[in-house]
């Protein structure tokens, strides 16, 4: 675990209390979008009545490096409450996080949106929470399909061309 601590400002606490179905965190590289968004995303997963959720990045390697295993990432922040099953396990053959909550275990599938064949296989049901890292680089078909199947969406993005579909939709 990291020796860094996640300190919560009054503004951050207000953000955590804000209950909306869709949230976008836009800012420059290293602005802190990921640690801020991930923490709230995991809290939303814990509150969700649904068991299945999705965490998406360009590919699973990017998700592991930038989201799951980084300092102040999911494993760092939630420790023994979360197990990463990078090769899948048991009932679920695709990479996922097993999140132990007081309401029972939750599954967070780790999906790469860079390969259409793989994400097409991953989508096919209803999900509680969806986290899309760098949504401005994601396949817009993935964004549409995944968002339609989820109750809550948290997305991060770096400033980009305002003409992109992700800004229009």
Q: How should these model regions be labeled?
A:
Residues 1-169:
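Phosphate/NTP-binding elements of NTP-utilizing enzymes
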């Amino acid at each position: 675990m990291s020796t860094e601590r996640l300190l919560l400002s009054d503004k951050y606490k207000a953000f955590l209390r804000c209950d909306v179905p869709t949230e976008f965190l836009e800012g420059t590289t290293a602005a802190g979008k990921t640690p801020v968004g991930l923490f709230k995303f995991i809290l939303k997963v814990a509150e969700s009545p649904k068991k299945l959720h999705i965490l998406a990045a360009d590919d699973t390697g990017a998700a592991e490096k930038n989201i799951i295993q980084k300092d102040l990432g999911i494993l760092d922040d939630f420790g023994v409450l979360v197990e990463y099953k990078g090769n899948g396990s048991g009932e679920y053959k695709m990479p996922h996080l097993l999140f132990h909550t007081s309401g029972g275990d939750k599954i967070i599938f780790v999906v790469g949106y860079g390969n259409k064949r793989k994400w097409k296989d991953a989508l096919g049901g209803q999900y509680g929470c969806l986290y899309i890292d760098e949504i401005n680089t994601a396949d817009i078909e993935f964004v549409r399909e995944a968002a339609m199947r989820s109750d809550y969406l948290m997305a991060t993005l770096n400033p980009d061309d305002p003409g992109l579909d992700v800004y229009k939709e």
